[in-house]
């Protein structure tokens, strides 16, 4: 079967492209051209029946990925489906199952069966769980894992194929060395075997598998900087040059490709990083982790990274990988997922507003109008997180009568600036101008993409009892 890239190059507008066009408020032909040029991807495995197609590309609304998954100490199917539900409910455009513990197949298939958004994985994690030692990994094992996950319905896979043996000495003087799990695993394998990265040497064979199932390749940045001290160094950019080569080779196989990026980057270097990736990788979508702009705030890295993510989105990054408050500290739970998603939906939206994406500011205007009109219920409805917005308001003013009040508990009755301003205008010569100030933006007519209009996400809680049992896991 052909991939979305091959269909696009043949001039065919697929059903997935039409659905994407509707969600983005764009012409289907614009979508087809972006996919054909490699400037956008539609991760849509032929076997993912629950998928509602979406698009990742710099000319479209900025997307957000949420990482979920268990570890060797936590998590079962019910826990993971709760994280999936939380992530999608609060606006995740894709999720990555990064499980490294037990029941990998059961968790992965449950996520795919229940997820309306694309599901990504890092296949080398499963490979590690199937051997006694990292050095026991073989090219055949990696190929087997990739093929199995492709058949299960995984929509995109991170492959750290650009980490080459000759790059490793470039990391010797780093402050934090190699911080990518995939990158460190492959570094150990290459060092102990004295051989080249098997994902690189067997890349063409892997691409043939991905093409057969239309799995998008997400070229992992195994040498991304793990501290601002290591940002934009020779190791990072040597790998990036290889990722540019691998992007073009994926396209030659008809495989959709996006490229992953840092990491930890000072604010003043972010735009240059985005521009460099776009040039080296011929405009392939850039998928960035953060980046964190400072390293001083464990427990608040959803904030330090959302700052960098906003600038990355403004500069042209196509998708942001969220960071939760638990980053560098522990495995996130459902509440951490909620906080991470809020930070990154804000970052993506703010980046789109700053970049002038069509209709992106309409949501802001609608909420500002409701705020000025003291329409509390509409403010809650339009909020990024309606439940939290109303809960915070109702902590101090819980009564229904306060939903008609022209103040909140921040300023009280006498010091509300908007009430004072309205009263002054009503009493003055420009009272007729109030009509202009209280017009209401019609979001149903907005040109904004779906992700830049409320609600941010809706998702029925998955039926955990229908998920595969732990006994179904092939990895045990």
UniProtKB/Swiss-Prot annotation:
UniProt-annotated stretches for the region Disordered: 1-27, 425-476
GO molecular function: 4 iron, 4 sulfur cluster binding; carbon-carbon lyase activity; zinc ion binding
Keywords of the record: 4Fe-4S, Iron, Iron-sulfur, Lyase, Metal-binding, S-adenosyl-L-methionine, Thiamine biosynthesis, Zinc
Binding-site positions, substrate: 67, 96, 125, 160, 180-182, 221-224, 260, 287
Extent of Basic and acidic residues compositional bias: 7-27
InterPro entries (alphabetical): ThiC, ThiC/Bza_core_dom, ThiC/BzaA/B
Family label: Belongs to the ThiC family.
Identification of the protein by name: Phosphomethylpyrimidine synthase
Higher taxonomy: Archaea, Methanobacteriati, Methanobacteriota, Stenosarchaea group, Halobacteria
